[in-house]
Amino acid sequence: MDTDFEPLAPSLENIIDQETLKWVFVGGKGGVGKTTCSCSLAVQLAKVRESVLIISTDPAHNISDAFDQKFTKVPTKVNGFNNLFAMEIDPNVGLNELPDEYFEGENSAMKLSKGVFQEIIGALPGIDEAMSYAEVMKLVKAMNFSVVVFDTAPTGHTLRLLSFPQVVEKGLGKLLMLKMKLAPFISQMGSLFGMQDFNADTLTGKLEEMLTIIRQVNEQFRNPDQTTFVCVCIAEFLSLYETERLVQELTKCGIDTHNIIVNQLLFRREGQAPCAMCSARYKVQGKYLDQIADLYEDFYVVKLPLLDKEVRGVENVKKFSEYLIKPYCPNGTNETQEQDK
């Protein structure tokens, strides 16, 4: 490590202070506490932003458990906040799970097009999931939140989400090639139902509309002024390996990432002798913290404690969120506590 390099603050205050940020992703290996961290970050952002939305794209939907409040596909205000909203979506479901109003248009053709649309795109691998995501993003953009926090699914799902624009573009190309072959059949079906304005252009127009949305969002995702990705891990080999893979993939995708949260750490307390198990775990964690310091010297690295109780409920999330800004100290002061090497 370069001894002349001044370590960055062990805090996510850089995210809170970046007023241009529009999209914040929080992700990592399963079981490292991503949801607690994403909810805590959303709470801190709600202090300085006009309106904040946290979206769970993890099928487990743990933000309902974290805030101890049931959330749905519709943005719902978090209890105790006027400007913090939450919603849960499943990126693995397709268009059949979306509300009918997503397909409403000025003419009756669009009301019929949902079912036909599903049948046509169903044969295109991966596009159903991508289109569902596009419709959700369309809804989110229309609501115009100041900042959106994504509590993402485990790493593999997250990387697939970032590849959606390419999936849709590939699918669009296939669909456009089929357009001429399908056009007579679709026109006949429209005539059968008495809707002359229902044709191939209606269907491809819907797909192109969503592709435009995905391209716009994708462009914003690759703008470091508007988007950043926070990696969450624990001080263990597999988690650190997964984090490095995630950082490399994000870099390859052009997604900014310069913050890492190391969660579930043991801290020594003055005047208390640790048990043999805690001492052993403390030593292992110290080894991987050294590796993190070497690998990510140009990252903001936040160290969060393993607590003796669950972080559940709004008040507990609020308290825990303070550790993202002010480093945790087991002895009750605000000074940064480093693990013994």
Curated annotation (Swiss-Prot):
It is found in: Cytoplasm; Endoplasmic reticulum. The active site is at 58. CDD domains: ArsA. Zn(2+) binds at residues 275, 278. One of its GO terms (biological process) is tail-anchored membrane protein insertion into ER membrane. InterPro entries: Anion-transp_ATPase-like_dom, ATPase_ArsA/GET3, ATPase_ArsA/GET3_euk, P-loop_NTPase. Its EC number is 3.6.-.-. One of its GO terms (molecular function) is ATP hydrolysis activity. Pfam families: ArsA_ATPase. PANTHER family: ARSENICAL PUMP-DRIVING ATPASE ARSENITE-TRANSLOCATING ATPASE, ATPASE GET3. Homodimer. ATP binds at residues 29-36, 236, 263. The keyword tRNA-binding does not apply. ATPase required for the post-translational delivery of tail-anchored (TA) proteins to the endoplasmic reticulum. Recognizes and selectively binds the transmembrane domain of TA proteins in the cytosol. This complex then targets to the endoplasmic reticulum by membrane-bound receptors, where the tail-anchored protein is released for insertion. This process is regulated by ATP binding and hydrolysis. ATP binding drives the homodimer towards the closed dimer state, facilitating recognition of newly synthesized TA membrane proteins. ATP hydrolysis is required for insertion. It comes from Aedes aegypti (Yellowfever mosquito). Keywords: ATP-binding, Cytoplasm, Endoplasmic reticulum, Hydrolase, Metal-binding, Nucleotide-binding, Transport, Zinc. GO terms for cellular component: GET complex. This is ATPase ASNA1 homolog. Belongs to the arsA ATPase family. NCBIfam families: GET3_arsA_TRC40. Its main location: cytoplasm.
